């Protein structure tokens, strides 16, 4: 059941979406249901986001109540609010979009009735200080595929339907992940965990290889695959749907080159893999010989 949320009374910085799209509800198990604003400038929670939330519900119980959580790229705030609902006392959330932060705060009041989450407008870790902001668990469910080819970008420039389109909203996920992985160890307490959801179209092997190259001299990095889901490729805007042919060709090229993974169902739809990993970073000790 949808709830009616008055956006303008909750925040003067948010323009109200059409009345028929005011809100939507998601259920994650253990009685945890959240009602979220459906605002055109903030990503609606995807099937992958729902799977990520369901994992959090199963993974983090009362023993984590006093742990410090950081949710990077919070979007609607769904995972931060879910953690608070599950009893986590200290939750910080960042997003590069000021509209997302405004909507997340509205969602917080609608679902929790109080401002308990520390929301910060920030590009990844930019708004945080590693000397004061160290966390037991960091969450990241990054959007985006890998960097598009030069041929794709040239074709896109010749396509009228691509005018005004934000390419960064869908592509360059590998660059975002590189920036994220470059800094994340600085914000993890000893023994802390990183929970991250990766899209197989981002090029997971290359991303993990770059992570090891960056940090293996200073950290022992361990990871495990917590769960994997398969979802059909969804193009959420009319502009992206008009570019479906170009996008499919690009994804097929990535897959043929071994730079990404997808498969096709009987209808010819692209099916991608969503993979949730848990990572730990243990600082290497240095003996007298520097080994």
Walk through the language-model features, giving the residues of each.
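SAM-dependent Rossmann-like transferase core, predominantly class I methyltransferases
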Residues: 5-86, 246, 260-279, 284-290
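Short amphipathic alpha-helical segments
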Residues: 105-106, 150-153, 207-209
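Mobile active-site "lid"/loop adjacent to the S-adenosyl-L-methionine
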Residues: 139-176
């Amino acid at each position: 059941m949808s709830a009616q949320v008055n956006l303008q009374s909750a925040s003067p910085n948010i323009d109200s979406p059409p009345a028929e799209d005011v809100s939507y509800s998601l259920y994650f198990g253990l009685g945890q249901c959240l009602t979220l604003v459906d605002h055109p400038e903030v990503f609606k929670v995807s099937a992958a986001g729902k799977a990520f939330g369901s994992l959090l519900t199963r993974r983090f119980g009362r023993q984590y109540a006093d742990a410090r959580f950081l949710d990077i790229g919070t979007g609607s705030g769904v995972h931060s609010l879910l953690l608070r609902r599950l009893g986590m006392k200290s939750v910080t959330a960042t997003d590069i979009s000021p509209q997302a932060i405004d909507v997340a705060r509205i969602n917080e009041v609608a679902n929790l009735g109080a401002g308990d989450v520390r929301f910060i407008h920030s590009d990844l870790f930019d708004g945080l200080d590693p000397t004061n902001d160290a966390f037991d668990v960091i969450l990241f469910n990054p959007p985006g595929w890998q960097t598009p080819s030069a041929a794709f970008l040239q074709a896109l420039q010749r396509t009228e339907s691509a005018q005004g389109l934000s390419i960064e909203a869908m592509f360059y996920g590998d660059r975002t992940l590189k920036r994220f992985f470059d800094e994340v160890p600085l914000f993890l307490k000893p023994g802390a965990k990183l929970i991250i959801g990766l899209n197989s179209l981002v090029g997971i092997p290359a991303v993990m290889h770059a992570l090891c190259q960056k940090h293996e001299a200073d950290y022992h990095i361990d990871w495990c695959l917590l769960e994997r889901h398969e979802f059909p490729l969804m193009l959420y805007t009319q502009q992206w749907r008009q570019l479906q042919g170009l996008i499919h060709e690009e994804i097929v090229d990535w897959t043929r080159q071994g730079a990404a993974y997808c498969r096709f169902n009987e209808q010819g739809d692209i099916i991608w893999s969503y993979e949730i990993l848990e990572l730990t970073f243990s600082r290497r000790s240095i003996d007298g010989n520097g080994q």
